[in-house]
């Protein structure tokens, strides 16, 4: 017996054309809302991680009163909702739900300045190499950076993977046995000397610093964005180091221009490599758009440096040896102004001049910043 069944649907069904976008497009703390005045650097969105910075003096109770303003993809919703105070004394998760039900989870956390670094925690960076089936597999281009520090490792990835200037097993900055637990090992590499849209020097020094490394192929010295926001008056940087100079010191000579550029590594037998550790405090108007780099730090025309100090004894040390860098103040410190601070370690003192010895190795550990009381 044939039957006809009539079905009546209620509500709004999916049509198949709904948006799948489930992104947080902006996350800010507006002035005048809750405890938002404690936020000194607005949130930065990096994938599904969102980080921001508050003043060192910010207490837990204030962190519970921060009120974010959140923008999401069109027709998406977010939970917890925008404009509602959350307890940011710990990590806070937000779930964005797209029109079609697709969900994406974001984690929001605070980044705070530190005065002591033991190099026990390292952050993995994957080159995302894949096999024939598209699965991510380990690669010689993967690397680790010490937590809280920037390194030149991403530049070494280019030298190894794109330019074939260094062997695939070359190490720039990596873990080593430290004075106590782990330390950071910096190695200068033989990068042959060539011209590939930019000058690739004969020797590429490894660098470790407070700040951010953003590859600039037009001028590689501008890749190092030295400095993090700083809210104290640093006086001294202390720590421990070991150093072994490479066998042959080279300088890099460049002639010609454009694709006719010739890059040559010239041995300098009378020179012995040494390491460098520098500390610098400088003034800014904006934390996110201003920095010193490998050019401006050493430029006599730079006028916003407030204090600087350099470790002068970078000779070989076979055992961990204390070092101390005292900052020399060129201008008066004003707590009402904005400052950025960096510690810069290099396996070759003259690396910014494209000079040094392949194989030079610096290991640092237990670095401490002593501030004025």
Provide a role label for each language-model segment.
Residues 193-286:
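Extracellular-facing segments of soluble proteins and assemblies that are Gly/Ser/Thr-biased and enriched
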Residues 118, 236-242, 278-280, 324-328, ...:
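Residues within well-ordered beta-strands of beta-sheet-rich folds
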Residues 109-160:
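Extracellular carbohydrate-recognition regions
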Residues 174-195:
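Short carbohydrate-recognition loop motifs
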Residues 221-228, 321-333, 350-354:
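Signal that preferentially marks extracellular ectodomain short beta-strand elements
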Residues 286-335:
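Extracellular carbohydrate recognition and processing domains
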Residues 317-319, 335-338, 348-371:
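Extracellular carbohydrate recognition
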Residues 1-117:
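Beta-rich interaction/scaffold domains
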């Amino acid at each position: 017996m044939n039957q006809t069944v009539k079905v009546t649907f209620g509500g709004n069904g999916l049509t198949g054309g709904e948006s799948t976008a489930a992104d947080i497009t902006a996350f800010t703390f507006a002035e005048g809302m809750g405890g938002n005045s404690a936020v000194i650097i607005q949130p930065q969105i990096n994938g599904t991680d969102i980080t921001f910075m508050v003043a060192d003096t910010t207490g837990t109770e204030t962190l519970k009163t921060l009120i974010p303003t959140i923008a999401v993809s069109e027709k998406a919703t977010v939970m917890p909702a925008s404009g509602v105070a959350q307890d940011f004394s710990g990590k806070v998760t937000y779930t964005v739900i797209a029109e079609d039900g697709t969900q994406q989870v974001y984690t929001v956390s605070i980044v705070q300045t530190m005065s002591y670094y033991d190099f026990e925690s390292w952050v993995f960076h994957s080159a995302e190499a894949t096999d024939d089936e598209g699965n991510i597999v380990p690669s010689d281009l993967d690397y680790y950076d010490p937590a809280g520090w920037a390194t030149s490792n991403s530049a070494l990835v280019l030298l190894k993977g794109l330019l074939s200037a260094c062997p695939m097993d070359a190490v720039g900055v990596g873990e080593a046995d430290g004075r106590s637990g782990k330390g950071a090992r910096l190695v200068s590499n033989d990068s042959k000397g060539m011209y590939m849209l930019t000058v690739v020097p004969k020797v590429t020094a490894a660098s470790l610093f407070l700040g951010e490394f953003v590859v600039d192929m037009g001028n590689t010295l501008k890749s190092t964005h030295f400095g993090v926001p700083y809210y104290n008056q640093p006086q001294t940087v202390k720590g421990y180091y070991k150093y072994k100079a490479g066998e042959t010191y080279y300088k890099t000579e460049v002639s010609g221009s454009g694709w006719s550029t010739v890059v040559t590594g010239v041995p300098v037998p009378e020179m012995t490599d040494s390491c460098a550790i520098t500390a610098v405090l400088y003034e800014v108007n904006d934390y996110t758009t201003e920095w010193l780099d490998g050019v401006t730090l050493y430029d006599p025309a730079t006028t916003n440096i407030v204090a600087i100090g350099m470790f002068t004894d970078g000779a070989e040390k076979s055992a961990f040896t204390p070092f101390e860098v005292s900052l020399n103040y060129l201008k008066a410190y004003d707590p009402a102004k904005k400052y950025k601070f960096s510690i810069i370690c290099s396996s070759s003192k003259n690396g910014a001049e494209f000079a040094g010895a392949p194989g030079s190795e610096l290991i640092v550990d237990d670095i401490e910043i002593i501030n004025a009381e």
